[in-house]
Amino acid sequence: MKAIDKMTDNPPQEGLSGRKIIYDEDGKPCRSCNTLLDFQYVTGKISNGLKNLSSNGKLAGTGALTGEASELMPGSRTYRKVDPPDVEQLGRSSWTLLHSVAASYPAQPTDQQKGEMKQFLNIFSHIYPCNWCAKDFEKYIRENAPQVESREELGRWMCEAHNKVNKKLRKPKFDCNFWEKRWKDGWDE
């Protein structure tokens, strides 16, 4: 299968996962905006004949396409060859970082800390590797200013921002009453 580039007349609009393929400004598939499976499909690393995916996103009978390679990097005893993160891995990791930052934010921040948090979130929305995700978060920040007066306000604001994304992705809403247990204190059990 030939790799897709910007010269292709009709690049795929949907990947093997069923998600819409996101292309960057140059018309090339965005690596961090698509799942690994879809990116490999549109770049020709796997073929359209791979429709027999199991429910966990792996090809039936193989461990392929999970993003985890069993080979070690050349000259390494510990580092494995792993592909760059896809949109799902990037999203999970980013939300983990953002929620953890909110959970460690002071209960009573100084004016400097408030300014730094606003600046961090603003910069984050500009540099996020998935361009359409970045624009969406930037828009959310414009329409819903980050609440940085306290840890409680920031944690709830972050939870609400995450739930907005979850809704777009048709994922269940997280009960923001539990944000501290999930991201700061842990569960009582």
Curated annotation (Swiss-Prot):
Residues the record lists as binding FAD: 88-95, 99, 128, 159-171, 182-183
Reaction(s) catalysed by this chain's protein: 2 R'C(R)SH + O2 = R'C(R)S-S(R)CR' + H2O2
Organism: Saccharomyces cerevisiae (strain ATCC 204508 / S288c)
SUPFAM superfamilies: FAD-dependent thiol oxidase
Coiled coil: none
PANTHER family to which the protein is assigned, alphabetical: ALR/ERV, FAD-LINKED SULFHYDRYL OXIDASE ALR
InterPro entries reported for this sequence: ALR/ERV (IPR039799), ERV/ALR_sulphydryl_oxid_sf (IPR036774), ERV/ALR_sulphydryl_oxidase (IPR017905)
EC code: 1.8.3.2
Subcellular location as annotated: Mitochondrion intermembrane space
An example Gene Ontology biological process: protein import into mitochondrial intermembrane space
Keywords: Disulfide bond, FAD, Flavoprotein, Mitochondrion, Oxidoreductase
GO molecular function: flavin adenine dinucleotide binding; flavin-dependent sulfhydryl oxidase activity; thiol oxidase activity
Disulfide bond residue pairs: C130-C133, C159-C176
Functional description taken from the UniProt entry: FAD-dependent sulfhydryl oxidase that catalyzes disulfide bond formation. Required for the import and folding of small cysteine-containing proteins in the mitochondrial intermembrane space (IMS). Forms a redox cycle with MIA40 that involves a disulfide relay system. Important for maintaining the cysteine residues in MIA40 in an oxidized state. Reduced ERV1 is reoxidized by cytochrome c. Required for the maturation of cytoplasmic, but not of mitochondrial Fe/S proteins.
CC cofactor: FAD
Subunit-level organization: Homodimer. Interacts with MIA40, forming transient intermolecular disulfide bridges.
Name of the protein in its database record: Mitochondrial FAD-linked sulfhydryl oxidase ERV1
Pfam families reported in the protein's UniProt record: Evr1_Alr
